[in-house]
């Protein structure tokens, strides 16, 4: 449900004159190789990186980063209204409670009513922390339908990160190295798929010359538990 708030702010940025990735998105769409679900995820990925600074969702939500609701138009008591107008964290949780599910039902009408009645006594930060499992690092989950191309999306993220990292080498938001983990019990089915990352054509998302340069620079190393243990300094 939280994604709806993020998506709205993301789309506002993409259509604004402040958006710095319009050319990248336009190229990807015109190239026609990535699927709609992949492109949508790339838009979100770039928004979280560039605009949100790769901050934890808990932190972004608490800062009111995705607030869009006009509190002045809400049916609230003066006490509740003043609280929500002056506390971005409170306003964020209130807006969250009013989100609609796919079937049209409100996400949490009980939470909405509780906020209205107890606006000044709620520990909003604690509730938001629980919503995001008390995670204090950037923990983003991109959920795509089966067969939508999750492996190639991972490859696209890697190449885009490297592209921006080269443009801004001192910007900690963009990564220079990557690690992908696969559960050992499923490695026979997952690892072959993950190896497709090495075969991804970066010209699907970046201009030919830029794509060739990145392709020449990137190095892949596939490790498994047995070979990694042999080369480690672990003493049993």
Residue ranges: model-predicted function:
Residues 1-236:
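RecA-like P-loop NTPase motor core of helicase/translocase proteins
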